[in-house]
Amino acid sequence: MLQTAPARSCAPLTARRCRNCWPARSAAGWLRLDRTAIEVDHCAAGALPIVALIAFLLGLILAMQAYVQLRVWGAEIYIADMVGVSVMAEIGPLMTAIVLAARSGSRNAAQLGAMVVSEEIAALEQMGIRPLAFLVAPKVVACAFAALALSIVFDLVAMCGGALFAWSVAGIELDAFAEQLRQALSVSDLLVAQGKAATFGLAVGVVGCALGLRVKDGSEGVGRATTNAVVLGIFLVIVIDAVFVTCQRMLVG
């Protein structure tokens, strides 16, 4: 009779193959750059049209409200100051983070929650693949990068909207508007605003992924995690913004 060799588990071999076939990893091996690029494309490129539209309309609205108040004293030129400072310091990073929480935070929670329910996360762990490196880290880094990039776009488009209103209604030339913006804003303002935006994006990414990985109760739990990711993400962003403003005022004195 033919003797058959005892069956051996292929899990260790599969795990080794999966670990060795990961392309485009960082030097530390903790972040998959190829997956991060895909997530950045979804977070940033996917949200770009709605962010640009909101920014343009808010720039128009802010300039309109400022014009109503400033024309009483003949100080219409300061429309640029009000639009530039308010957009860069607060509205730009906040609105970008809110859009990101609604789109990417909810998506991350739903995607990871569905993977938990279908036991895909457990399967990755059995194969020796770290879910934090394979799934979570790319999403969190992508949210931070997308928030930074979208905040810059938001600021530029909103100021264009404000400049368009100032030129068409208040009679302010575009070069005068730009010069007033240059005087009102500084490099430190830009750095603080973009640091704030990146922190907001990081918070949105962490909240969405954390809630997704903690899903229980099947599809109902996925829906609950998705809703909570948006609500908690926006709440956390506002809390972080309050901390930023408080610390900034304490340092400035």
Where are these regions (language model features)?
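Membrane-embedded translocation segments of transport machinery
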Residues: 76-114
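Membrane-interfacial helix-loop-helix connectors in multipass membrane proteins
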Residues: 64-89, 156-198, 202, 206-228, ...
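Hydrophobic alpha-helical transmembrane segments of multi-pass membrane transport/permease proteins
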Residues: 50-65, 242
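Membrane-interface helix starts
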Residues: 26-36, 41-53, 234
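Short cytoplasmic-facing helical segments at TM-TM junctions of multi-pass membrane proteins
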Residues: 111-137, 219-222
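Final/C-terminal transmembrane alpha-helix of multipass membrane proteins
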Residues: 222, 228-246
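Selective transmembrane-helix segments that form parts of the transport pathway or gating/packing helices
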Residues: 44-52, 136-159, 230, 234
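Short, membrane-interfacial amphipathic segments enriched in basic
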Residues: 1-36, 211-212, 216
